[in-house]
Amino acid sequence: MEAKTSGPKQIQPSTPAPPPSTRRPRVREVSSRFMSPVTSSSSSAGDLHSLTCNSPKQHHLQHHQIQRSVSAQRLRRQLKMADGDENRSSETAARSLDSPFTLSQSRKSSKPSHLKPLNENSHRLETPTPMVPPPPSRSRLSQQRLPTATRLLQLSGISACYEKEGIINIQEKPKSNGSDQFPTLSCRTHLKVFNNPVPSSLNRSVSSPSSSCNVRESSSFSRLGLPLPPMAPKVPADTKKQRKVTEQLEDVHSLKLLHNRYLQWRFANANAQVKTQTHKTQTETMIHSFGSKISELHDSVQRKRIELQRLLKTKALLAITESQTPCLEQWSAIEEEYSTSVSQTIQAFSNASLRLPLDGDIMVDSKQLGDGLVAASKIVDGITQNVGNYMPKAKEMESLLSELTRVARSERSLTENCVVALLKTQASQVLNLSLHKLKNVL
């Protein structure tokens, strides 16, 4: 074992001692897993074996943890054997305890390089700090106090529990930041264990032994009269789930509000559509009634116009015949007189012819016969003169009667044309009303 530890000591270059620091040494922050005795390997391995689950992934993880715990115990033995060696720096010992790798790998990792920022506590990135070797006085002080603290914790019997917690923290611990030069178990590591999104089965498997370790730790500290170490605040592991649940509830509530608003708008649109439809039907019925009334008024107007034209024609005819009515009245009276006179003349001629003797000796007075013939000729001349006087009036009356018949014929033709025009107007009016209704419907 000494040969193994002397090999890395010869390879490590000597570093210049920095100026002494006035900072208080961080002895309380030394993790308990570095102070556990060598005999605690079986107990820690047994406890870790009890945390295994039925799944193959968790079994492989626990097997890897047991291998790391064995390597950490070997490094602790090397540290105890090389405790009196002053050439071995405290930083190398602390790094060898903190990591499960060899001392050469820890020495390679301690070289200055570009460090990746840590992501812990709600995935917040921290700026990396350069690694500064601790002062010699501080390393010596930590080497002196380390065995005493180890003895105290061996007496209390709580090193096994801290070793289990240390194994869990080794699995989840990121690369070294360089700000802490001692292998400490800070509160940030505990917070990262709670906040790290590891599977829930591993958290459940780790929770039961940690609670028993806390009970034994409190009882051991109460027996020794030492103050209890500060407990890390428990951060709920399901904050993200709660946040997601609240966001989902808010989304559901907003969707419900939007759905209610959509239903309100649909109801308003449907109500407005129904009102518009009723108003449209009422307007259509009113327009139809108005159209029927307008058609009736149009028919009455056409009838009135026809009657007016008829009255105008009658008035013109009356104006023409009104001047001829007195002549017609006189003609009736003259016709009666002339008819009576003609009848009397005929009777006188017949009487005179009957008085002539037809047999025996007839004696005729020529003078009386001549006087009778002269009187008869005078009567006939008067009759012919009167008839000649009434002949132009009769011709004029004949022309007027012919003109009256012609006007009556034209009136009859105009009446027939008016009937045809009325039929055409009615058909066009019906077509116009149907077109208006079709336009309103569209």
Swiss-Prot record:
A Pfam entry, by short name: QWRF
Protein family: Belongs to the QWRF family.
Bias type Basic and acidic residues, positions: 80-89
Biased composition, class Basic residues, residue ranges: 57-66
Gene from which this protein is expressed: QWRF6
Species in which this protein is naturally found: Arabidopsis thaliana
Span(s) of short sequence motif QWRF motif: 264-267
Region (Disordered): 1-144, 221-240
Protein's recorded name: QWRF motif-containing protein 6
